Design a protein with these regions (language model features):
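Selective transmembrane helix interface/packing segments
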Residues: 45-479
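General helical secondary-structure elements
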Residues: 13, 20-23, 32-35, 95, ...
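Short, low-complexity, charge-dense intrinsically disordered segments
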Residues: 4-10, 17-43
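Short linear motifs in intrinsically disordered/low-complexity regions
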Residues: 10, 15, 30, 54-58, ...
Length: 479
């Protein structure tokens, strides 16, 4: 333990005092030299992640002004990086889903292409590029052509306001970022309707109508579930929401467990993922709204679906899991700011990947709901739950403010960056958040106690037994 605290240039001196032999000294000197070389290489690699120090100097040498670099060149570089990384993320999300499903079913999954099947997404992409781009004879060609691009664009535009990390790890810090996410992501509904209608297929049209009804229904619950967290953040900026959680040193999922569950369920239904994948029910609608699509256009819908899953996971990470914030990571900023940004990026990716794993886990665990159950969950359960959560959150904040200063009790520290509370205020808020889950469940059970969609007892009572007709059968079989 004493050796771990020694600087590199004092390690040989430490062993010489301890009476180390010559061969051991030589091995030690070579090890120290290797460590120094590794540290120099690491420091040089860190320069690659210092855009202000290195890349800005290179760009200034090209003759561009500082304003052109800041407002034109840098956004293009960030957009290119985000699109490339998200596309790779989406490609390997399919690989992870196949591996997870194989693990649950005691199989190996993709193993043929590359080591452990790691090149399988690349092989799938090449296969789709070589497939025939088939367009139905009576389809509306232009709408049929543009629908997949609308779906992909609506998913990828959202990443422009997602804070993957501090400083240069976010493309645009918009003061209405969360509202922009909800507005742009809802455009994806238009792509599915256009794809179903332009295909001139009854199965595609029914799939498009189902998806539009489902997504519009669950968008309401998704938006309402975020209001409770916004009451604590006091801003619509995505970076501001992360800063509010960092300044209060706590994630909003602790205050809003019900809001997080509501948002996650609504997001899964919004993405048409199992158990809410009614628009793509194979037994009823073949492949839903993309039944008539093939080749690369079909893969664009596939990419849009997985990109939308990443969007929901990233928004849940930002609003409820602290985004790139993690305890004690901010101390790296004073040591090496570039390392701090990289570690923050990794923290964000790990949190988002955990939520994506929940997506895959639920798909291979739960059966598909009936359509009436699907709509009832959205309108009779999630929307009332979100409204109850808003009322309870408002009551909790009112109680915290009312108790502040009462009989020497201090519950609020500051309101500069969100609602920053003392340990007493945090304890009260956590208790109300946990209690709110049970209050919401009790109220929903009371509201829907006569509903027969999920009540097996009522369904059994409504079953009418058919009396067996009297007499002999028309055709008698002789034994």
């Amino acid at each position: 333990m004493i050796l771990l605290g020694q600087p590199l240039h004092k390690v040989p001196e430490y062993f010489s005092r301890k009476g180390a032999t010559a061969p051991r000294k030589q091995r030690l000197n070579s090890s120290v030299a290797s460590l120094r070389a590794a540290r120099e290489i690491l420091s040089e690699l860190m320069l690659l992640f210092a855009p202000i120090d290195v890349l800005n100097d290179l760009l200034l040498k090209t003759g561009l002004s500082a304003d052109q670099i800041n407002f034109f060149v840098w956004p293009l570089i960030q957009i290119g990086l985000v699109v490339t990384l998200v596309a790779l993320w989406v490609a390997y999300a399919t690989y992870l889903e196949r591996k997870i499903s194989a693990f649950m079913q005691a199989r190996l999954g993709p193993m043929r292409v590359g080591p452990w099947g790691l090149l399988q997404p690349i092989a799938d992409g090449l296969k789709l590029l070589t497939k025939e781009d088939f367009i139905p004879e009576n389809a509306d060609r232009w709408i049929f052509f543009f629908a997949p691009y609308i779906a992909v664009a609506s998913a990828f535009i959202v990443f422009s306001v997602i804070p993957f990390g501090p400083d240069w790890a976010v493309i645009a810090d918009v003061n209405i970022g969360l509202l922009l996410v909800l507005a742009v992501s809802s455009v994806g509904v238009l792509a599915l309707i256009l794809a179903g209608w332009s295909s001139n297929s009854k199965y595609a049209l029914l799939g498009g109508l189902r998806s539009s009804a489902q997504m519009v229904s669950y968008e309401v619950a998704m938006g309402l579930s975020l209001i409770g967290a916004l009451m604590f953040a006091r801003t619509l900026s995505m970076s501001g929401i992360v800063a509010a959680q960092a300044s209060d040193s706590i994630w909003f999922i602790v205050y809003q467990p019900a809001g997080f569950l509501l948002f996650l369920i609504s997001g899964i239904a919004e993405n048409n993922r199992a158990p809410f994948d009614l628009p793509e029910a194979e037994s009823e609608l073949v492949a839903g709204f993309h039944t008539e699509y093939s080749g690369m256009r079909w893969s664009l819908f596939f990419m849009a679906e997985y990109a939308a899953m990443v969007v929901v996971a990233a928004v849940a990470t930002t609003v409820y899991l602290g985004g790139w914030y993690f305890p004690f990571v901010n101390r790296l900023a004073s040591v090496n700011y570039n390392l701090y940004v990289i570690v923050s990026l990794l923290v964000f990716l790990v949190k988002t990947s955990i939520i994506l794993y929940i997506y895959f886990w639920l798909r291979w665990t739960l059966p598909r709901f009936r359509y009436d159950q699907l709509m009832d969950i959205g309108w009779k359960w999630l929307i009332p739950s979100a409204l109850i959560n808003i009322v309870l959150s408002g009551f909790a904040i009112f109680l915290i403010q009312a108790l502040n200063g009462w009989r020497g009790i201090t519950t609020i520290e500051t309101l500069d960056r969100g609602l920053n509370m003392t340990a007493t205020g945090k304890g009260i808020m956590i208790g109300i958040g946990i209690l709110g889950v049970f209050i919401t469940a009790a109220l929903l059970a009371r509201i829907n106690w006569r509903s027969r969609d999920f009540n097996l007892k009522i369904q059994r009572r409504n079953i009418k037994l058919v009396n067996v007709p009297k007499g002999k059968p028309a055709v008698q079989v002789e034994s």
